[in-house]
Amino acid sequence: MNKKFKCIGIVGHPRHPEALATHEMLYHWLKSKGYSVIIDRQVAKDIGLKDAQTGGLTEIGKQADLAVVVGGDGNMLGAARVLSRYDIKVIGINRGNLGFLTDLDPDNALQQLSEVLDGEYRNEHRFLLEAQVRRNGQKPRISTAINEVVLHPGKVAHMIEFEVYIDERFAFSQRSDGLIIATPTGSTAYSLSAGGPILTPNLDAIVLVPMFPHTLSSRPLVISSESSIRLKFSQNSNDYEVSCDSQIVLPIQDGEDVIISRSKQKLNLIHPQDYNYFNTLSTKLSWSKKMF
């Protein structure tokens, strides 16, 4: 039997009344069940909770043992990068569009969540990537990503030139619009749209997917998650950037390299007991339907 939970964190950045209603319903339901609840302070303000215990993601990560993220995949990615620093499990209620990482249907969320709170859930550890933009002798600029780190030009789309080193050995050079470096979690996101393979979440692997390469022979490359990737550039790299989960942007200056490796952090994602990854591919991405 999985451990049960005592303190529940409620997280989200709602844009729609339906999402706010879900936050409010969830808060009062958890309190009626006798749980200690800490809710995102901005959400508490938006729904008019005056006596609730509130905090930011850091406080929720430190105090709660389960965080319920209400929203879409973007909300989950933003919260997960912070919550992965702490010993806290995370589950999502989908109030977005695709909801690939947010398992719980808002119309049936309380029933599913009740089973989870009773200890009936599946554990899954998702690793993150760490991106460092660095120059010798200087402090690097660092961010993490759940889905992917993307190398791309800045404000104007154009072809860029770079070299890729894996474990400090030259692997390939490329002229393209950029490069997507994705985790198994991110293999069903931007990487998939660019022609990358689907990696099941239990794989310790990273996929490198070229973006519109100026060659007929370029193909996605899958490597061990234990490998490090170094991107080197010509002297004209002032308008290059790397973005993490399309939410954090690190500009690249002349003379700087980018190093991407597996982060020490991991996301403790949990799912309902009946969760099936391949069913998620089918329902969310309209993947192959069962024939018989």
From Swiss-Prot:
It comes from Photorhabdus laumondii subsp. laumondii (strain DSM 15139 / CIP 105565 / TT01). Coiled coil: none annotated. InterPro entries: ATP-NAD_kinase_N (IPR017438), ATP-NAD_kinase_PpnK-typ_C (IPR017437), NAD/diacylglycerol_kinase_sf (IPR016064), NADK (IPR002504). Belongs to the NAD kinase family. The gene is nadK. Keywords: ATP-binding, Cytoplasm, Kinase, NAD, NADP, Nucleotide-binding, Transferase. The active site is at residue 73. This is NAD kinase. It is found in: Cytoplasm. NAD(+) binds at residues 73-74, 147-148, 158, 175, 177, 188-193, 247. GO terms for cellular component: cytoplasm. Its EC number is 2.7.1.23. GO terms for biological process: NAD metabolic process; NADP biosynthetic process.
